[in-house]
């Protein structure tokens, strides 16, 4: 029984301790309920919260940015996530905290109270006003704080002059849509936009964001309407565009410059130009999706791309002209004197170009050696002389002069006399071609050359005279003349001092055959002589002096054709050398033009690059 009494006392004590707490909570809730009933009984949310109709409702306005979502250059629109801060006083919503259990503030639905109709004037898309109506914080003195979040798409005039190094000034204009300045006036909470909770953007950085109070009279109305305009100065982060836009443009420009450094002989200049032009065209198709499509101003990068396009097009035109100059020849074009003077003399010195002359000198040396070889007295080897000739010299008893009937083969016994011999056994004496006559000798004999003549042999031009002789031991009653010639190359000296008298003149020489044959076989053979008189006419010493400059020539027609062929080859090489020289001059002119435009395009490319970066740098955007 005592246990039950003690247990009942404990329950009474517990209830006594709990009931005051519940009574306090119930009293607090009852106080707010009573407060709400008191505040909103007969409250009209459509009327301005002023005691006198002439009073002005002061609305303190502020803005806090949470995120810069996007800046659309094409649509010229800025999307932001902001908190709209608003404060005003409502005299109808006041109370004494002592009457309501010291309740100093309550949260009330914003739909139940009067709100200023503040909207975004420069709204581009979506709702002008706040759509998410959060609860307002009401204080006992009638002060109301309302901070609803909002995502605004405000129109922004995008200036893409220095794109991608641009800096934009986007504005957000807030004001009452229906109440003029006499009804509602705005007061800025802070001079700057609150960025304490700002989430940094990956493309834009906010340089500054300030708010300015303005009053404006619109054409539609006679009243003055106040507004607070926030200016967001934002700058683009150019790293993405530098890597994906500017550097490729610079590389394309460099490729265009390299076109003029490429030799014309490789044949890839036009291919490189067309490849650069096609790559730039494809690149421009991608750029149009990035660059703002506005006609108000041309972006700087657009100007640079247009400059590069013109750059590449001009390089193609110039390359075609350079290739045309490079492949010119004497058969198609004649090089004017001013071109030779300007592009072969003046401009290369200004460009510090030095033309190599090794190939041209080698060609000249080759042709000179060919001419020297054809005129050389030792063109043929001495060992190739025919051994079938025999000599018999019989000087005339009437005179010291060589007899016209002396054997021509006598001088063949002297191996030191001939200076040039052909492999075919042909001899020639080099001199200008005077008229030739043919004479006959009743006795086959050869007149030997005098010592003065043989020692004065030197270089000369080779001509052909045919020598006839009879073979050894032919059949009886028949004499056969065969064409056999051995080349002697010599020049007649102006004077001969051998034995104190003049040598025999070439005009007095007679060409005869001397062969071993039977005495009873007379024969007669015709030969060619140089300005000879009739056969058997003796030559005079004075005649010899009068014909000093003439030379005796003995050459066969075949040898003459061979020598003429060599001269033809030499002349052909000389003509080819002249053509080659003119072609090389045209090629050098093309190279000089290439070098001129190489330096010009390098300078223009550097100036264009500087023009791309200098204006933004001067404007303080880089």
Curated annotation (Swiss-Prot):
- Name the predominant localization: membrane
Q: Does the keyword S-adenosyl-L-methionine apply?
A: no
BP term (GO), one = synaptic transmission, cholinergic
The yes or no answer to whether the keyword Transferase is present is no
> Glycosylated residues?
52, 102
Reported regulation of activity: Activated by a myriad of ligands such as acetylcholine, cytisine, nicotine, choline and epibatidine. Channel potentiation by calcium is stoichiometry-selective, CHRNA4:CHRNB2 nACh receptor is achieved by calcium association with topographically distinct sites framed by anionic residues within the CHRNA4 subunit and between the CHRNA4 and CHRNB2 subunits. nAChR activity is inhibited by the antagonist alpha-conotoxins BuIA, PnIA, GID and MII, small disulfide-constrained peptides from cone snails.
Q: Where is this region: Disordered?
A: 380-477, 497-516
Could you tell me the membrane topology recorded for this protein? Multi-pass membrane protein
Cellular location of this protein? Synaptic cell membrane; Cell membrane
**Record keywords:** Calcium, Cell membrane, Disulfide bond, Glycoprotein, Ion channel, Ion transport, Ligand-gated ion channel, Lipoprotein, Membrane, Metal-binding, Palmitate, Receptor, Signal, Synapse, Transmembrane, Transmembrane helix, Transport
Report the InterPro entries cross-referenced here: Neur_chan_lig-bd, Neur_chan_lig-bd_sf, Neur_channel, Neuro-gated_channel_TM_sf, Neuro_actylchol_rec, Neurotrans-gated_channel_TM, Neurotransmitter_ion_chnl_CS, Nicotinic_acetylcholine_rcpt
Entry GO MF terms: acetylcholine-gated monoatomic cation-selective channel activity; transmembrane signaling receptor activity
- Summarize where Ca(2+) binds, as residue positions: 71, 73
Ranges of Low complexity composition bias in the record: 390-407
Reactions listed under catalytic activity: Ca(2+)(in) = Ca(2+)(out); K(+)(in) = K(+)(out); Na(+)(in) = Na(+)(out)
Give the signal peptide, or none: 1-23
Cytoplasmic-side stretches of the chain, per the record, are 326-595
All disulfide bonds of the chain are 156-170, 220-221
State the Pfam families in the record. Neur_chan_LBD (PF02931), Neur_chan_memb (PF02932)
Tell me which family the UniProt entry assigns to this protein.
Belongs to the ligand-gated ion channel (TC 1.A.9) family. Acetylcholine receptor (TC 1.A.9.1) subfamily. Alpha-4/CHRNA4 sub-subfamily.
What this protein is reported to do is described as: Component of neuronal acetylcholine receptors (nAChRs) that function as pentameric, ligand-gated cation channels with high calcium permeability among other activities. nAChRs are excitatory neurotrasnmitter receptors formed by a collection of nAChR subunits known to mediate synaptic transmission in the nervous system and the neuromuscular junction. Each nAchR subunit confers differential attributes to channel properties, including activation, deactivation and desensitization kinetics, pH sensitivity, cation permeability, and binding to allosteric modulators.
Q: What is this protein's name?
A: Neuronal acetylcholine receptor subunit alpha-4
From the UniProt record, report the name of the gene that encodes this protein.
CHRNA4
């Amino acid at each position: 029984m005592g246990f039950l009494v003690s247990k009942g006392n404990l329950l009474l004590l517990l209830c006594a301790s709990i009931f005051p707490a519940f009574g306090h909570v119930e009293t607090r809730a009852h106080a707010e309920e009573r407060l709400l009933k008191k505040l909103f009984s007969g409250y009209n949310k459509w009327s301005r919260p002023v005691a006198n109709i002439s009073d002005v409702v002061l609305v303190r306005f502020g803005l806090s940015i949470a995120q810069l979502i996007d800046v659309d250059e094409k649509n010229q629109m800025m999307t932001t996530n902001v908190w709209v801060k608003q404060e005003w006083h409502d005299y109808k919503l006041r109370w004494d905290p002592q009457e309501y259990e010291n309740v100093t503030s309550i949260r009330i639905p914003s739909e139940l109270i009067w709100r200023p109709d503040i909207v975004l004037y420069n709204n581009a898309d979506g709702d002008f006003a706040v759509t998410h109506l959060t609860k307002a914080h009401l204080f006992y003195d009638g002060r109301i704080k309302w901070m609803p979040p909002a995502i605004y798409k405000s129109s922004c005039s995008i200036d893409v002059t220095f794109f991608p190094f641009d800096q934009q000034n986007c504005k957000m204009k807030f004001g009452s849509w229906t109440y003029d300045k006499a009804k509602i006036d705005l007061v800025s909470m802070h001079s700057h936009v609150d960025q304490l909770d700002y989430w940094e953007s990956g493309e834009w950085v906010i340089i500054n964001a300030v708010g300015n109070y303005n009053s404006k009279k619109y054409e539609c109305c006679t009243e003055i309407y106040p507004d607070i305009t926030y200016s967001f100065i934002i700058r683009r982060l150019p790293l993405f565009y530098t890597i994906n836009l500017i550097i490729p443009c610079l590389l394309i420009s460099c490729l265009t410059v390299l076109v003029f450094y490429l030799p014309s002989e490789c044949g890839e200049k036009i291919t490189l130009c067309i490849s650069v032009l096609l790559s730039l065209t494809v690149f421009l198709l991608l750029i149009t999706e990035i660059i703002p499509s506005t006609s108000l101003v041309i972006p700087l990068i657009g100007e640079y791309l247009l400059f590069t396009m013109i750059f590449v097009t001009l390089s193609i035109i110039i390359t075609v002209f350079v290739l045309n100059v490079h492949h010119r020849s004497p058969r198609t074009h004649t090089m004017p004197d001013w071109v030779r003077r300007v592009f072969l003399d003046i401009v290369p010195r200004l460009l510090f170009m030095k033309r190599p002359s090794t190939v041209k000198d080698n060609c000249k040396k080759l042709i000179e050696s060919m001419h020297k070889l054809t005129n050389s007295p030792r063109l043929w080897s001495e060992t190739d002389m025919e051994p079938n000739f025999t000599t018999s010299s019989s000087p005339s008893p009437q005179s010291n002069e060589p007899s016209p009937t002396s054997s021509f083969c006598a001088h063949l016994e002297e191996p030191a006399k001939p200076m040039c011999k052909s492999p075919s056994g042909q001899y020639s004496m080099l001199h200008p071609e005077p008229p030739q006559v043919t004479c006959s000798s009743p006795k086959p004999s050869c007149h030997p050359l005098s010592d003065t003549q043989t020692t004065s042999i030197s270089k000369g031009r080779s001509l052909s005279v045919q020598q006839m002789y009879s073979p050894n031991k032919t059949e009886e009653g028949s004499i056969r003349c065969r064409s056999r010639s051995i080349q002697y190359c010599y020049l007649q000296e102006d004077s001969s001092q051998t034995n104190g008298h003049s040598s025999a003149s070439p005009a007095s020489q007679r060409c005869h055959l001397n062969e071993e044959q039977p005495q009873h076989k007379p024969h007669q053979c015709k030969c060619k002589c140089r300005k000879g008189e009739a056969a058997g006419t003796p030559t005079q010493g004075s005649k010899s002096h009068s014909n000093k400059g003439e030379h005796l020539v003995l050459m066969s027609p075949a040898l003459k054709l061979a020598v003429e062929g060599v001269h033809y080859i030499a002349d052909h090489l000389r003509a080819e050398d002249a053509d080659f020289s003119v072609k090389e001059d045209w090629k050098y002119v093309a190279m000089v033009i290439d070098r001129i435009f190489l330096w010009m395009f390098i300078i223009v490319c550097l100036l264009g690059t500087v023009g791309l970066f200098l204006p933004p740098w001067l404007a303080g955007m880089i």
